Structure formats: C-alpha cells, structure tokens
UniProtKB/Swiss-Prot annotation:
Transcriptional regulator. Pfam families: La (PF05383). Residues 1-76, 105-187, 382-545 are annotated as: Disordered. This is La-related protein 6B. Residues 23-49, 465-478, 510-519 have a biased composition (Low complexity).
C-alpha cells in the first residue's frame, strides 16, 4: 500500500494547459466532422456552452400525435326535399354541470342538432355564438342516415306535440268550466252567491238581530203584515256589493225558506211573524258585554260566557264612530245612558233563560277594574229603568228609542245617517214638551230663557232641571210678563197629554228639583252661550254680570 501511494503521489496531476490542449484537439476533431455533417452545427454550439455536461439520451420515443379526423361533407339534399331550419332561441342553452369531452365528440352549435352537416351554409352568422359539446351526436345519423333525410320525421313529431298540447289546454279549460258554479237563469248570479245573499238577509230578519237593532223593526211595526221594502234591504253594504237592482234581489230571496216576497217583488217579510212580546222576552235573556279581551274571537267569548250557563248566540259589534249623523241632543243623552255610540268593541250574548243572564252580570262583571275590566249588563234593564223614575214617557216609545240607540251602537251599516238624524230629532222634539216649567220665580225672563234652553238642548227628560240661558227668547219673555200663570198652566196641559199629572200648585213644582239627585254621574255639557249649567236641583240665582 505504501508503494502504491508513493506511485500515486509521484504521478503529477494534469495541469490546466493539458486540459486546454485536449479540448482544442477535441474541438478540432469535432469541427472537422461538423464540416462534413451540417446537422451537427447546433449540437456543436451547445457543446461549447456546456462542454462538461453529459449528453441527454431519451429513455423512450414519443409517438407522433394523431391527426384530427377529417370532416366529410355530405352531398346536398335532393331538389324535391325542403330543408327546414330551427329558429335560434333568444338565449343560449345553459350547460348544467361539467360535460366530459371525448376525442370522438364534435363541438356543435346548440340550436340545431345537425349543424355539423350544414355548417358551411350559415357559419358566418354564428361566429360569436357559444358552442356546446353534444353527446351521442352520431345517433341522428344512425337513425336516418343522412341528416337531411331525418327532417320530415322531426317536423311531424313537432306537429304532434303541438296538437297534444292544444288538446291538453282544451281539456284544462273544460275542466275549469265544469268545476265552476253554474249560473242561475233567473237572477244571472252564481249559485254560491245566491246562497250567501239568502243567508245574509235571513240573518237580518233573525230574532237576535231584530232584538238588538231597531232599523228593520220600525218598518215591520209600520206595516200591518210585517213587510219591509225591498229597497231598504238592498241598501245594506253587503247586499249592495253583489246585487245590481231590486228586482234581482227579489228573485234571489224567493229561494229562501224563512222569507216571503210579495207578488210585485217590492216587499219582503218573515214567514213566521215576530211580536213585541217575543222581542221583550228575548231581550231579557241578552246581556251586553264591553271591554272585551284583545282576542275576542267567537271561540274565546264562548269559553268566557259559557262558564255561567248555556249560550245560544254571540254577536260581536265594532265600535261606532263618534261623528255619525245623530243630533247633539241624541249624543248627549247617549253619554248619560251609556248605551249609545260605544267607542269600544262590545258583544251581545243570548242565554237560554233569564236567570243565566242575571247570573252572568253578577259573576262576570269586574267591578274592581273599572277602566279595563269586563263590563256586563242586562239589555232589558237599561231599557226599562228610566220609565220607573217618572220621566213621563210611554213604554213603547221608550223601547223603540233604546232599540234605536242599540242599533246605532252596533250595526252602523244597517242605519242610514239621514234616517237616524230624522228619527232622533223627532223623538227629542217630543221630549221637549215634557220638561216641567212653571216654578214660582219672580223673573219671568229667566223662565222664558229656561224654556228656550230646554228646546235647544233636549236634556230635560222630565228631571225638572233648572238652566240658564239669557241670550234666547228675550222679546218673548218681555211681552209675556203679565201672563205667568197662564203660560205655566199651558205647559202643564202638555204634560197631561203625554201621561203625567197636571200640576197647578206651585208647591208641587218646588218638589221637583229634588229629582236631580238621580241623574247619571258625570259633568253636564255647556250651553255654548253663557257657560256651564248651575244648580243641579238648587234654586237658580240669576246673577248680573
């Protein structure tokens, strides 16, 4: 080993000059060979740049890429065959999901299935159109051979599809026509609309509606047979929205089993007549409930009021607008009575017997929560308590008045404003004559002013309330200063006509102011000319300002 290391160390390493001489000799040899083979010039230049790099030898040979298949243009179709093109859709057909492209697929324009056979005809019009690869495009050629021979079958199939769609649409129309309600030949209305109208008018003539409203009862009481003019029923909002004229409504109501239409078609009445005694008996079993809960549907109200006993009917009424057509006298009396122009949702509940209604008033009324608690009262009690206080009014007229008030508070759609104003004004004109005037006063002018005040306000109602009004009837009282007793007796004569006893003794008149203690609570309204009313049962002291 020592000898070998000595020999290796004694052998001089190759110097740089030897490498250069070797490369020069190699390059000279290469140049000689390159001059003979010109294709080796490129490899010679690369060998100069990196002479020390090993030569790259590929491990396998890459086969040449196959050329794409050539498209064979078929011959044009014969002259006797008409070639039809499909219209281009307004938008390109979207591609839902990726479609793998295989080498045998040909990109074809999406609007025509045989576009590759006729691309030379109109390729200039669709240069910017989107091309979608179509799978199994050769299926058309396999079925029909040449693309032009398949067109008649496609056209016939398209026509068959159109005919089928037309038949389906026609069948749908027939089905819809068959499902619709048939039209009545007499009235010209659908049968379902006729039944709705009949049910609505029967409800208007029902016992509960007649007992809680007075609009139809006034017409029933006026007619000896209990007829109501057909135009009155046709004026209701729900009927007016469906009916065109009165004769059409008369024809519709002939289908009712509870109503009878006159021969001329101008009047309608109940088949089973209703009497005043039946109305009073029904009203005694009805309670009026106010301050209802927020969710006052029929089911919830039935749960509340059925805890007392069996409930037959419940009728919920919306609040009445304050600006209805009643005169100021009727509105002020309504506030004192508590039955007119309710500004809250209220309900009429009909029980089986009177005892259940009285029990409901006792158990369901929330007296502790007077602001928002449930308020329950008897309907008939409010109608009969005021004649017991000696107001000098007949029972029949008072019942009609209270029923009229309930009608205003509940069913505003059944009470025209003009009729309501006329009836209220007529009733309050009658009440004006009932105001007892004839107190022993030294100032006849004040007595005449009280008379004018009572006529304008309509608030007397037999209470004997003294009032002040020094801006009315000044000339009338000045000319009648010498006829005090005669004027007083004249007014007592009017009281005798409406059912009260005449009073000629001034001492009897002095006892009447004591009745002011029974008037309903709450402030009285101002007269609008001098200020607020004073006294409330005390002797009036006229003060000069």
């Amino acid at each position: 080993m020592a000898d070998q290391q000595t020999l290796d160390s004694s052998t001089p390493p190759p110097t740089q000059s030897d490498d250069l001489s070797h490369s020069h000799s190699t390059s000279s040899t290469t140049s000689a060979s390159s001059s003979s083979d010109p294709s080796l010039l490129r490899s010679l230049s690369l060998s100069r740049l990196n002479a020390g790099a090993p030569e790259f030898v590929p491990g396998r040979t890459t086969p040449p890429l196959p050329q794409p298949p050539r498209m064979i243009i078929p011959p044009p179709p014969p002259h006797g065959m008409l070639h039809m093109y499909h219209h281009q859709p307004p938008f390109n057909t979207p591609v839902l999901g990726p479609v793998p492209i295989q080498p045998h697929l040909v990109p074809v324009q999406n609007h025509h299935p045989h576009h590759r056979f006729h691309q030379h005809h109109h390729h200039n019009r669709h240069q910017n159109q989107q091309y979608v690869p179509v799978r199994n495009h050769g299926e058309y050629q396999q079925r029909g051979g040449v693309g032009g021979e398949q067109e008649p079958d496609l056209v016939s199939k398209k026509n068959d599809r159109r005919d089928h769609s037309k038949r389906e649409s026609k069948n749908d129309q027939v089905t819809e026509t068959g499902a619709s309600v048939s039209i009545d030949s007499k009235t010209g209305l659908p049968e379902d609309s006729i039944q709705k109208i009949v049910n609505q008018v029967e409800y208007y003539f029902s016992d509960l509606n007649l007992a809680t409203t007075d609009h139809l009862m006034r017409f029933i009481c006026k007619d000896p047979e209990g007829y109501v003019p057909i135009h009155v029923v046709a004026s209701f909002k729900k009927i007016k929205a469906v009916i065109n004229n009165n004769s059409q409504l008369a024809a519709v109501l002939q289908n009712s089993a509870k109503l009878f239409v006159s021969e001329d078609g101008k009047k309608v009445r109940r088949i089973s007549p209703i009497t005043e005694s039946a109305i009073e008996e029904l009203q005694s079993r009805i309670i009026v409930a106010e301050n209802l809960p927020e969710d006052h549907c029929y089911q919830n109200l039935m749960k509340i009021f059925s805890t007392v006993g069996s409930v037959k009917n419940i009728r919920t009424c919306q609040p009445q607008n304050n600006g209805s057509g009643a005169p100021p006298a009727a509105r002020s009396a309504a506030k004192s009575d508590g039955t007119l122009f309710s500004n809250k949702v209220h309900a009429f509940v009909e029980y089986e017997i009177v005892e259940l209604a009285e029990r409901a008033v006792t158990e369901l009324s929330e007296a502790g929560n007077w602001r928002s608690g449930l308020k329950v009262r008897l309907m008939l009690k409010h109608q009969t308590k005021e004649p017991k206080q000696g107001q000098g009014r007949g029972r029949k007229g008072h019942d009609a008045d209270v029923e009229h008030e309930e009608d205003d508070a509940t069913t505003s759609e059944q009470q025209p404003i003009e009729k309501q104003s006329d009836d209220c004004s007529g009733e309050w004109d009658t009440h004006m004559q009932e105001q007892p005037i004839g107190e022993d006063q030294g100032n006849e002018k004040a007595a005449g002013q009280r008379k004018g005040r009572n006529r304008g306000r309509g608030k007397g109602r037999g209470r004997g309330q003294p009032h002040q009004n020094q801006n009315q009837n000044n000339n009338h009282s000045h000319n009648q200063n010498h006829n005090h007793n005669g004027r007083g007796n004249h007014h007592h004569h009017h009281h005798h006509q409406v059912g009260t006893q005449p009073s000629n003794n001034p001492m009897n008149n002095m006892e009447q102011p004591g009745m002011g203690k029974q008037q309903p609570p709450g402030p009285r309204m101002p007269d609008g000319t001098r200020g607020f009313s004073m006294g409330r049962g005390k002797p009036v002291m006229v003060q000069a300002e």
